[in-house]
A protein has these predicted regions:
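Flavin-dependent oxidoreductase catalytic cores
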Residues: 1-125
Length: 125
C-alpha cells in the first residue's frame, strides 16, 4: 500500500525529513484503512528498514508482506543477514534519496550512499 504523486516524486518516495511521511512505515496507516474493504493480502511499504519493526507489523496483522526498495539498495544482504542472525550488521537506509532517487532523476542509475562504504569493506576483507 503506497501513494503516488507524479508531480512531486518526493511524496511518492519520501525522504526521512518529509513533513508527513518521514517516519518508519510511513504508508502503513493506509493499510489499516484498505483492510476495511478487502480480505486480500496487503503489502506494506515505506521506510521499512528495521527488521523488528517489520516483524511486529506482520505479527500484528497490519500487513501480510513487506516491500522494500531503498532498503535493499542500502543492504542487498538484508534477508541473508537476518537469516544468519546478523541483524546488527545491516546497513539501514537513512532515506536520504541522494544516490537512489537522485541518481534515477539524473539518469545515472540507482545506487546508494552506502555503496562506497560497502566497497571499502569488501576490499579490506
Amino acid at each position: 500500500m503506497t501513494l503516488a504523486n507524479h508531480s512531486a516524486l518526493e511524496n511518492t518516495i519520501p525522504p526521512a525529513n518529509h513533513p508527513y511521511f518521514g517516519h518508519p512505515g510511513c504508508f502503513l496507516k493506509f493499510c489499516n484503512e484498505v483492510r476495511q474493504y478487502t480480505d486480500l493480502p496487503i503489502c506494506g511499504v515505506g521506510g521499512l528498514n528495521d527488521p523488528d519493526f517489520v516483524e511486529q507489523q506482520l505479527f500484528d496483522g497490519h500487513i501480510q508482506c513487506a516491500a522494500m526498495s531503498r532498503q535493499l539498495l542500502a543492504d542487498p544482504d538484508w534477508v541473508n543477514k537476518l537469516k544468519n542472525g546478523q541483524a546488527k550488521q545491516i546497513y539501514r537506509c537513512v532515506r536520504c534519496n541522494k544516490k537512489c532517487l537522485g541518481g534515477l532523476m539524473a539518469h545515472q542509475g540507482t545506487r546508494c550512499a552506502y555503496d562506497a562504504l560497502r566497497e571499502k569493506e569488501t576490499q579490506k576483507a
